[in-house]
Amino acid sequence: MSGQSRESAWSLLTEYTQSESLRKHARAVEACVRAYARKFAQEQGLDSDAAAELEKKYSITGLLHDFDYERFPTPEEHPYVGNKILEERGYPEDVRRAIMSHADYTGVQRQTHMEKVLFACDELAGFITATALVKPSKSLAEVDAKSIRKKMKDKAFARSV
């Protein structure tokens, strides 16, 4: 991913996304996919340079997966408009494909590890945030694994989120 940096991805995100909650969501997904990239790199026995490059690619993908959503929120636009912007800015095809695959309605099947991880982390980050929002403090600090597992058993919880 030469040419793209986390800083340039953050700049692109903040150019298109003003909502602090969407920015927090992007950072949460970024952190989640980065952790999975680190684990995957270890499992694959990658050297430190290859592992760092993999982690960077996953991080940028997680950070940018919804960057266009605030301006282009409809299924006809998101993530299609974002994909075109990323292509114009030189982001690699695998990053763009992962971002396309995170939205079921695009019809892009999730095939690679990064595509599957992005989808899972996007869903999980949203669920954890919803769990925090029903706490009296509305704080992530009050959310633990037990409360998340409890909410996962409740089929009606966060259905409309």
What are these regions (language model features)?
Residues 1-75:
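Acidic/His-rich, divalent-metal-binding segments that scaffold phosphate/diphosphate chemistry
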